[in-house]
Amino acid sequence: MPLPDFHVSEPFTLGIELEMQVVNPPGYDLSQDSSMLIDAVKNKITAGEVKHDITESMLELATDVCRDINQAAGQFSAMQKVVLQAAADHHLEICGGGTHPFQKWQRQEVCDNERYQRTLENFGYLIQQATVFGQHVHVGCASGDDAIYLLHGLSRFVPHFIALSAASPYMQGTDTRFASSRPNIFSAFPDNGPMPWVSNWQQFEALFRCLSYTTMIDSIKDLHWDIRPSPHFGTVEVRVMDTPLTLSHAVNMAGLIQATAHWLLTERPFKHQEKDYLLYKFNRFQACRYGLEGVITDPHTGDRRSLTEDTLRLLEKIAPSAHKIGASSAIEALHRQVVSGLNEAQLMRDFVADGGSLIGLVKKHCEIWTGE
């Protein structure tokens, strides 16, 4: 399939996707019933969309194009009520978190969808292992060249986005010692990590043509980069966050990305170059492993900074942009989170350290999602 032309969209508009866990009480393992839930809610959703993701234990909630985080929050809140009622009717529950702490990937059923079945054929068991749960945020751009500039700018802050959203310390019944273990699942994919370097949209079109020569890339959706342009939407899509445990944190993360995008495209503070990516995977690893306690290194100067320090610096820089787009509440909430030193991964570990089981942890996550 050829790459579509870049669809011009209103700059800084927003779209958010949340991959949710469908679980089966009282054991709280992953269920294989997302298709049943989708059928139950599809005629009751008035804004946004509820749809499949890779496996039958995953349920994706997606907003429409939104002006700001308040509109997105309203759509998510309405979807949440409908989905929770349908889940209760079918004796199921819903929760966030980047991984299910004890599910077995061998049990996961890939959705009966042409694209996912083709992906299963290409990637084999890796697709079942990819039963992990992330938040994706789209930001509108006026042109393909703007999208490439924005992608490179946002890539500088991938460690910050990972650290702030880290919510996947447990996997396959084990404490991974990572704050965010979810991104590791994709390390075997040939397109894992950052997009190959291009400096403008014309070069990106040439890159995509080259990738399409393989038998594995049929559309932009087949690429698993941390951040990718989405020409059919006219957006840049950030894909590195764990799904948070609460809607409010998901909305705050979206506000952070929207405000950062506004700052990047209005101020143009960086002259991007390929060397920017020299330590990308090392800095990304620090965020996954240690969260905000990680240390990132500047590839140009060798300077090392804690993610806590650098995240506070980012929040300060983008505060004026956040005010202009109505995202100040998100930046203020994230500032409080960083100063407090709390994150969802540590809260999960604290629950287990206090004597809680992994089954009890999932139950707790379901209660958090419903607001109990």
UniProtKB/Swiss-Prot annotation:
EC number, as in UniProt: 6.3.2.2
Keywords annotated in UniProt: ATP-binding, Ligase, Nucleotide-binding
Catalytic activity, reaction form: L-cysteine + L-glutamate + ATP = gamma-L-glutamyl-L-cysteine + ADP + phosphate + H(+)
The keyword Ligase belongs to this UniProt entry's keyword annotation: yes
HAMAP family, A to Z: Glu_cys_ligase_2
Function in brief: ATP-dependent carboxylate-amine ligase which exhibits weak glutamate--cysteine ligase activity.
Subunit structure and binding partners: Homodimer.
Record protein name field: Putative glutamate--cysteine ligase 2
Organism: Escherichia coli O17:K52:H18 (strain UMN026 / ExPEC)
Higher taxonomy: Bacteria, Pseudomonadati, Pseudomonadota, Gammaproteobacteria, Enterobacterales
